[in-house]
């Protein structure tokens, strides 16, 4: 059987490879501490689970849901955006529930790109931005993110011959993998740039509720004219510890939202209604879980940053997100240092090159590791310093 060229050319997904390597080590009886994957270890709050259990008992929730989601869910999403960011959204035309934001990100490329178009994609970045663009037949032009520019793309450096074919601009703040943040002035620059060059902006903002030291991330949609040029993807996964329930949202430009809705209606059957109802409980209920999460992640961030500095790494503590972006020691590549840490200590980190060529020289560590495992990992890192 011959597979399609798009599948033959599709690289293995980064985190599948990492999970496989961890499983192989553990199958051999090795003690492995993984800081590789950003999947919250904290439980979904009980009041949210209670709504799920209640909804699951109702036979009306056992049938096909609608692609566009329950009106009451779209209303809850719009009201949450109004309260959190001061952004007004029409729940009927500017809000679309998603089966996790990754699903919407993957589908967006098919809505806004034709073969031969160019997608402007940060590098390093969450791999799905580039992969989905390539699957849709578009070319990817990388926008390097580097420390010298606070891991923000230099939009004015994009060549005119690229801009003439570019249709989509991807941005993501608080950023994965760098942990960088962007203020309203940057988002305003993006909105103005997109309007000038007729670009559709896709902002991925799932980490807006994971921030430290009193910092409060803003939404791209707070910028003047942002809704005229783009949409924002958000997720309940990180905010409410709901990665396993698969629910997120796309909000913003009505034309883009309608395109995504039409595409999805031909490919999926929507989000199970019981999960939609638990999402309403999350959005409308107490938001104290967000403060509790941030306090836990900040404590873990501080412990890990200290441990990395103790083995000689020059690490900047992130203001937000679930990740520490750490430069590797001189004479190492991202991959060689990650491999040495795994072989010598049993600590798993993600090589920066897993997020693009501009990730060379860095590793990423996730804060979604139980405290006990964090301390074990720190002890292993201390042992690495003694042996090196």
From Swiss-Prot:
Pfam families: Aminotran_1_2
The UniProt record lists the keyword Transferase: yes
Ranges that cross the membrane: none
Assigned keywords, A-Z: Aminotransferase, Pyridoxal phosphate, Transferase
Entries under PANTHER family matching the protein: AMINO ACID AMINOTRANSFERASE, L-GLUTAMINE--4-(METHYLSULFANYL)-2-OXOBUTANOATE AMINOTRANSFERASE
The protein's role, per its UniProt record: Involved in the synthesis of meso-diaminopimelate (m-DAP or DL-DAP), required for both lysine and peptidoglycan biosynthesis. Catalyzes the direct conversion of tetrahydrodipicolinate to LL-diaminopimelate.
Protein name: LL-diaminopimelate aminotransferase
Source organism of this protein record: Dehalococcoides mccartyi (strain ATCC BAA-2100 / JCM 16839 / KCTC 5957 / BAV1)
């Amino acid at each position: 059987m011959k597979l399609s060229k798009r599948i033959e050319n599709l690289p293995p997904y980064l985190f599948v490879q990492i999970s496989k390597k961890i499983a192989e080590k553990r199958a051999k009886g090795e003690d492995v501490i993984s800081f590789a994957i950003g999947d919250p270890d904290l439980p979904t709050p009980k009041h949210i689970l209670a709504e799920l259990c209640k909804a699951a008992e109702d036979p009306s929730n056992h049938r096909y849901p609608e692609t566009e989601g329950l009106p009451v869910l779209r209303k809850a999403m719009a009201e949450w955006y109004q309260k959190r960011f001061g952004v007004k959204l029409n729940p009927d035309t500017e809000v679309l529930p998603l089966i996790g934001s990754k699903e919407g990100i993957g589908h967006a490329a098919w809505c806004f790109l034709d073969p031969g178009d160019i997608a402007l994609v940060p590098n390093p970045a969450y791999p799905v931005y580039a992969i989905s663009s390539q699957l849709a037949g578009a070319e990817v032009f990388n926008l390097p993110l580097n420390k010298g520019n606070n891991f923000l793309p230099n939009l004015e450096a994009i060549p005119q011959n690229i801009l003439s074919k570019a249709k989509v601009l991807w941005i993501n703040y608080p950023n994965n993998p760098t942990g960088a943040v962007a203020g309203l002035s940057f988002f305003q620059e993006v909105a103005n740039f997109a309007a000038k060059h007729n670009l559709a902006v896709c902002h991925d903002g799932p980490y807006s509720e994971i921030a430290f030291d009193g910092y409060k991330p803003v939404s791209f949609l707070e910028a003047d004219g942002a809704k005229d040029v783009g949409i924002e993807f958000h997720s309940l996964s990180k905010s409410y510890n709901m990665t396993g329930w698969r629910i997120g949202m796309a909000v913003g430009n009505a034309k883009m939202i309608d395109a995504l809705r039409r595409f999805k209606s031909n490919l999926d059957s929507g989000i199970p209604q019981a999960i939609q109802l638990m999402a309403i409980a999350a959005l409308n209920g107490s938001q104290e879980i967000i403060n509790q999460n941030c306090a836990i992640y900040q404590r873990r961030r501080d412990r890990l940053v200290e441990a990395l500095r103790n083995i000689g790494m020059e690490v900047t503590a992130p203001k937000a997100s679930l990740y520490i972006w750490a430069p590797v020691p001189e004479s190492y590549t991202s991959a060689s240092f990650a491999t040495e840490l795994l072989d010598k200590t049993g600590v798993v980190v993600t090589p920066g090159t897993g997020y693009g060529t501009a990730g060379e020289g860095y590793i990423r560590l996730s804060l979604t590791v139980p405290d006990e495992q964090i301390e074990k990992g720190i002890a292993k890192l201390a042992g690495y310093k003694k042996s090196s």
